[in-house]
Structure formats: structure tokens, C-alpha cells
Amino acid sequence: MKRLNLLFICLILSFSSLMAQNGVKELQLEEISSGYFKPETIQGIVPMPNSDFYTQMNKERTQIIKYSFQTGEAVEVLFDVNTARDCTFKQFDSYSFSPDGTKMLIATETVPIYRRSYKAVHYLFTIKRNLIEPLSDGGPQQVPVFSPDSYQVAFVRDNNIFLVKLLYNNSESQVTQDGEPNKIINGIPDWVYEEEFGFNSAITFSSDSELLAFIKFDESAVKSYSFPLYGGQFPQHKAYNLYPGTYTYKYPKAGEANAKVSVHSFDIKSRVTREIKVPIDEDGYIPRIRFTPQTDQLAIFTLNRHQNKLDLYIANARSTVSKLILRDESPQYIKPEVIDQIVFYPNNFSFLSEKDGYQHLYWYNSKGTLVKQVTQGQFEVKNFLGWDANSNTFYYESNEGNPLQTAIYKIDAKNRKTVLTENKGTNKAIFSTTLSYFISFLSETT
């Protein structure tokens, strides 16, 4: 391994030297690390709720501009740091809409933590009033999320969950009290869950906005791991220019104990917290929780340590009674990404499974009974993109016809299939929230 590393370094140095001799610009570490060489594409498209419009942040990170899905033309500027009332910042990093589309959460001063997690100072922007105001004065927040009625925001600070009520002068209350670094984490995953299961938030509101559910991670028994921090070039850590620092976090190596996880619900009116118990192996995982459209019904996903058995429980978040409604097993491995392909509708939910040898789209009712297998054949469904209730039409991305390419398809109630993209290559799509339009992204070798 040392020889390979040395050979790699020598090759890089030789390549850089050769480039310099030939008058070619040398590669710079900052350029490599910053994404300078990424292919150009349209980025940051955010579909607006209940509409055929989308938004983008401008390159200067000073405006949020509204566009039409139908024409691709700019319609209006929804937010501008120079004209918004009481705006004290000059740039912002990201944003999200409330479910009713009347408000936005705008993130500033973002500080990355791990691959997906970050802290930021968030502001609440009311579009009609053109008014910006701090979400909280208590310090940076993680994973702020609107309630379905758009009148509350939950977030995490210092491993505890907080709740802001927008109808009560943005009053803030603390939901959990036991959060502590390297011991108890509420509402956000530990490093292992974030890295292995690809998510950074473990908070969800009930459909009536009266309950809040979250995962608690107890990593008290997990062994710590430390590594040195140096000044560096990109990013720079000036505090460690003279003497290196140390970063310590809980890191369970293979075969060692993981964090103990539990699911809890919080009644916002009564302020009662309940633990919801589901059958799970001692070393099992809870990679996601999500409220369904049915009031009080919480979906809890569990995986065994080998990650080849996925269970879906539906729990009553008030009574804490749970029931197993779906189990999917694989001889090898179940990709955790399939959990994000599960979308709950009032009477049904979608599910991707390899149970017949290929990853296909399945349609279940809310009790876990299979209604139908939507797609079949010697190909795979890569992504479920949506279901139109009015026409009973499914939209998805598939590699049918060529395993090296993907296309966007729709299939109606009579199983009539239509290809929606014509160009050969890897096709991706972002749909409007009404499913009336989509933006297609094509990647090809030519």
C-alpha cells in the first residue's frame, strides 16, 4: 500500500512538472477541492409547492428567482437581499419553501459538519410581506423543517430539538432536554447513520401538525476516535497553523457497538413525549421515520445489521401501538436509497423492490396489501418520480432497453407505457409539483 501511495504521488508530481514544462497551467489544490472542474449544468432547481413554477438562486447568491416550467422564462424575483425588509445579510447559501408556498427558510453562515450535515443561521422570509426575520436568536440551527400547516418550524441545536410557533410571535420552546455531545443526539443522525443511510434529519411532523416524531441516538457506549487537524490550504484552519488540533467523535468500527436508537413522539399541545417501541434487533437500525397522510400514523423503517431485511411498521404516535405491514428481504443487501423512493399517499404508497430479480415499482394500499406490480421485465426502475391521482399515472426513470442508459417513462392505469425522453444517454428529470411539466437532464459520452 505504501508503494502504491508513493507511486501515485510521484505520478502526480511528474504530471504537474510536465504540464509546467509544456506551458500548461498547473492544477491547484483549491480548484480541485472547490468543484471548479465540475461539468456545467443547471443547478439548484427548487419546484414551488402546488404550482408549475420553480425557483433558482442567482450566481451572486443574492436573489431567489421564480421561473415557469412551461416556458423556462423568469417570472419574478421572490427574494432580494437588497430590497427585503429588515435584511441584514449580503448573501445566502440555500433555502426551502413552506408547504403552502408563502414562506421560505433562508440559510446563511453555513458551516459543514460531515458529508450532508451542517449548521447555519436561518431566517424566515414571508413572501407577501417581503419581510425577513431571524428564525431563532439562540445560535445556529440544524435541519429546520416546516409543519404541514406552515405555521411551525422545528429544528435542532446542540443535539436538542426546538419548536418555533409562527402564529405566536415566533415563540420558541425546547422539546428535548437530554442532548449532549458524544452521548445523546435528538432529531439528527450520528455519523454512521448519516454516512451509511444518506440522510441528515430525523424529525417529522404529523399531517395535522399536532405531533412531532423524532429518532433519539444514544451513542454513550460507542467508542471514540480522534484524528489530528492541521492548518491546511483548502479549507484553511488558521487556528491550527502553529499547533495541530484534535477532532474526536464516536466512530464504531466493524463489529463494534453502534448507537442505540429509539423513536419518540411529542404532542405539541400537551407537551407529552412518548416512546414508540418496535421490534428491532439489538444491533439493528432505524434508518428513517416519516408520518403518513393519515393523522397520527407514523411509518418506522428498520433494518437488521446485515442490511438484507427491511421492515416497515405503522405506529399510532399517540397510543404507541405499532404493526408490521411490509417486509422486504434480499439474499445480499437492500439499498437504503429505496426508502426515499417510498412515497405515502392518502390510500397508497410506492415501493421499489428487487423481489423478482430486478428493481421494479410496486403499489401498495395503506395497510400494506399489494395492489399491483407497476413495472415488469428485464430492466430496473432507478427512480420513482411521482403518481398523478387524477389519471392514475405513474412516472419513473428506468434503464429499459439498455442497461447503460436511462429514460423517463409514464405508465397509465391500463398499463400503457410512454417514453417521455427521446435522447439516448442518462436521462434525469425534475417534475413540477403538479406533475404537468418536467425539466430533463441528459448526460452522454458524445
Give the residues covered by each predicted segment:
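Blade-loop segments of beta-propeller domains
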Residues: 73-111, 131-142, 329-332, 378
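Signature of short aromatic-glycine-proline-rich micro-motifs recurring in repeat-based ectodomains
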Residues: 40-45, 89-96, 188-208, 288-289, ...
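Beta-strand C-termini and the immediately following turn/loop, strongest in propeller blades
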Residues: 54-60, 68, 96-99, 105-116, ...
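Non-catalytic accessory segments flanking enzyme active sites
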Residues: 42-46, 53-64, 76-78, 93, ...
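Predominantly five- to eight-bladed beta-propeller fold
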Residues: 72-74, 109-114, 118-121, 175-203, ...
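Asp-box/WD-like beta-propeller blade repeats and closely related beta-sheet repeat scaffolds
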Residues: 116-163, 168-202
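Surface-exposed loop and turn segments in beta-propeller and other repeat-based domains
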Residues: 29, 33-34, 77-88, 173-195, ...
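Residue-level detector of Asp-centered blade-edge/turn motifs that repeat once per structural unit
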Residues: 49-50, 99-100, 148-149, 207-208, ...
